[in-house]
Amino acid sequence: FSGSVNQACSGFGWK
């Protein structure tokens, strides 16, 4: 993930 979805990734625990 990268860009605006960065925050979403953190919530799901992905990188």
Swiss-Prot record:
This protein's UniProt keywords: Antimicrobial, Cell wall, Plant defense, Secreted
- Say yes or no: keyword Transcription present: no
Q: What is this protein called?
A: Antimicrobial peptide 1
Report the GO terms under cellular component: extracellular region
- Segments spanning the bilayer are none
| GO BP term, pick one | defense response
- Highest taxon of the source? Eukaryota
Q: Where in the cell is it found?
A: Secreted, Cell wall
